[in-house]
A protein has these predicted regions:
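Short beta-strand element of the alpha/beta-hydrolase
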Residues: 44-53
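The serine-hydrolase catalytic nucleophile loop
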Residues: 53-66, 230
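Alpha/beta-hydrolase fold nucleophile elbow
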Residues: 111-127
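Hydrolase active-site cap/lid region
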Residues: 135-190
Length: 275
């Protein structure tokens, strides 16, 4: 029996139905909270970490349900200091937290408990989460990753290096405008210092060799005013233009894909079939 996970419910499995469980995962002494959406069926499932941006108003849970119907386990969690997770919010912590969560879902007891295929654990991220997904892949922690309207942190860093005061003011406004109330302990001066210090290491275009070996999907939004494609998307495409494992899509929508959720889901579903 075939069905369309985009528009139809999955076939009923009374013995191994779809479900969800709350998560509390220790990361460097702080508890990360989140949810695991478990796909139906007895066999081990591929599993994705679905990473949100800053602060994380858009969590893409509509995508999580679609991907679960398509046979994927989906993890939606909050980084340290975000949305009630313990600890302090910092960009450096985000990358560390992702590694911790990947290790957690590859551990033998969790693999057995939640019917996970440990050889197929990937990352998919939106905005800041897209950058984090790319950096996680570049550092060799996954062999498949997708970035949705992904940030290039290196672009922010280069702007801070070249025009410190102007860029500092603009970046402060950008981060404050998205709303930082859900972020505990955020210190913009510390974040800006980290971005400057890591402006090359945190630029995905500097990791072309590593990313060219990854099964990669880059989805961008043509009308993205938060992270314009000419700064954050096209330069990375150019850096990876000779890699056959890199796929891309440009949708006519805004940063949150507000009027293109179905098109976004279909683009990702098509790519997931190649993972």
């Amino acid at each position: 029996m075939t069905f369309d996970p985009l528009s139809q419910d999955s076939p009923k499995d009374k013995k191994f139905p779809p479900s969800m469980v709350g998560l509390e995962i220790d990361s460097h002494g702080a508890l990360l909270n989140g949810v695991l959406y478990i796909a139906s069926g007895e066999n081990p499932h591929p599993t994705m970490l679905l990473l949100h941006g800053i602060p994380g108003h858009e969590r893409n849970t509509d995508l999580a349900h679609i991907f679960r119907r398509a046979g994927w386990n989906v993890v939606v969690f909050h980084y340290r200091g975000a949305w009630g997770s313990g600890g302090v919010y910092r960009f450096t912590h985000i990358l560390e937290d992702i590694q911790v969560v990947l290790d957690y879902f590859r551990s033998p007891d969790i693999v057995a408990r939640h019917r996970i295929d440990p050889e197929k654990v990937i990352v998919v991220g939106h905005s800041l989460g897209g950058w984090a997904a790319l950096m996680t892949a570049a550092n060799g922690f996954v062999d498949s990753a997708a970035s949705i309207a992904g940030l290039n942190m290196g672009v922010w860093g280069q702007q801070l290096v070249e025009s410190p005061e102007l860029a500092r003011s603009a970046l402060r406004d950008t981060i404050l405008d998205v709303g930082i109330a859900p972020l505990s302990g955020l210190d913009l001066d510390n974040e800006i210092a980290d971005i400057i210090q890591n402006h090359l290491a945190w630029n995905p275009t500097q990791h072309g060799d590593a990313l060219s070996k990854v099964n990669l999907l880059l989805v961008a939004a043509k009308r993205d005013t938060a992270l314009p494609v000419f700064d954050h998307h096209f330069p990375l495409l150019e850096a990876l233009k000779n890699s056959p494992s890199v796929k891309s899509a440009l949708l006519d929508t805004d940063h949150s894909f507000s009027d293109s959720r179905i098109a976004l889901a279909q683009t990702l579903l098509d790519w997931l079939r190649t993972v």
